[in-house]
Amino acid sequence: MESLTLQPIARVDGTINLPGSKSVSNRALLLAALAHGKTVLTNLLDSDDVRHMLNALTALGVSYTLSADRTRCEIIGNGGPLHAKSALELFLGNAGTAMRPLAAALCLGSNDIVLTGEPRMKERPIGHLVDALRLGGAKITYLEQENYPPLRLQGGFTGGNVDVDGSVSSQFLTALLMTAPLAPEDTVIRIKGDLVSKPYIDITLNLMKTFGVEIENQHYQQFVVKGGQSYQSPGTYLVEGDASSASYFLAAAAIKGGTVKVTGIGRNSMQGDIRFADVLEKMGATICWGDDYISCMRGELNAIDMDMNHIPDAAMTIATAALFAKGTTTLRNIYNWRVKETDRLFAMATELRKVGAEVEEGHDFIRITPPEKLKFAEIATYNDHRMAMCFSLVALSDTAVTILDPKCTAKTFPDYFEQLARISQSG
């Protein structure tokens, strides 16, 4: 297996221009494909997840052109639901941001499409979404294990009253919201349980509005969507920088700044993960907000005890930043870490212990007490891009760290380690 050893980093300083947001990129691609008119997307993320979405759109007959660096995409909208001319199988890797929205959107009209992916994708639950789509008339068959991909979709979604469990993944609701306006009838979506990762729903609603569709949001408990609508291209659309990707550089500055400035997101960003900066501030770092940047300066970091449900992805970065904070850090209400690219609660606890931390792993929380001195370790990344990026922060100590399978960052940030090196100074 490939590995990368990061030598101790004495200081970080500089500016990072963030790659486009994964969440925004894949939503924008799908809406542009469903819309009337041509859409030009700029600052599109070039990563595995986005490539899986683009490949699926190609197979579904959507035509688009990409710039040489794959960050500008011109899409000719289909002007309505996507149809495959014949039976089709789409391979979506481990891209939840492609699997969930396509599983819903391809239930409009009549299709015969199989959605499948990597072995890990077949372990990521999709039953709550399928249950909701079936309530709206969709014909969906599980081809292997009940409640998990691969799925066979045979159309039939017409709208109506639909309940969806919000407690596992907000992507299920996102998928329904993006699909419902194109259904022939009105759809009323009721949320069962507590809705996790609410800010991701705001990204979805924001993008739908950009593409000309508004819905009625009743306190995130119920959503009323008029049927028979169509999406309209906004012409051009700039994809925000990825706020989850920003978290590693901001945390690095909090630990070993200097000052690091990330551009492409700012105080008005639609991504909930910008609230990560508030957590660093609470821990003792100095944060400065601009319209299109966030900067962070080093501070003496203290432990925190917080509910992290609103920033599940960026909260992982706090778990490794906790190695540099005084006291015991507790991150709560993060059960959905367990259904991501890997079981992130288990993975995080296991690898933090390797570098010497004392860790308590609960059903939906993690408690971390840092050691006096970090130990050298080889970090397993579980084919999870965020594990690789989080544990790069260990090098901000006087201990080197080896990251196994460093290329797994390609899911959202192919040149992450090059960018980190660019702002790093060794002792």
Curated annotation (Swiss-Prot):
Functional pathway: Metabolic intermediate biosynthesis; chorismate biosynthesis; chorismate from D-erythrose 4-phosphate and phosphoenolpyruvate: step 6/7
Gene Ontology cellular component terms for the protein in this record: cytoplasm
Database matches in Gene3D superfamilies: Enolpyruvate transferase domain
Reaction equation(s) it catalyzes: 3-phosphoshikimate + phosphoenolpyruvate = 5-O-(1-carboxyvinyl)-3-phosphoshikimate + phosphate
GO BP: any one term: aromatic amino acid family biosynthetic process
Covalent S-S links between cysteines: none
Root EC class: transferase
Pfam families per record: EPSP_synthase
Residues that bind phosphoenolpyruvate: 22, 96, 124, 171, 344, 386, 411
InterPro entries from the UniProt entry: Enolpyruvate_Tfrase_dom (IPR001986), Enolpyruvate_Tfrase_sf (IPR036968), EPSP_synthase (IPR006264), EPSP_synthase_CS (IPR023193), RNA3'P_cycl/enolpyr_Trfase_a/b (IPR013792)
SUPFAM superfamilies: EPT/RTPC-like (SSF55205)
Quaternary structure annotation from Swiss-Prot or TrEMBL: Monomer.
UniProt family annotation: Belongs to the EPSP synthase family.
Function description: Catalyzes the transfer of the enolpyruvyl moiety of phosphoenolpyruvate (PEP) to the 5-hydroxyl of shikimate-3-phosphate (S3P) to produce enolpyruvyl shikimate-3-phosphate and inorganic phosphate.
Protein's recorded name: 3-phosphoshikimate 1-carboxyvinyltransferase
Gene: aroA
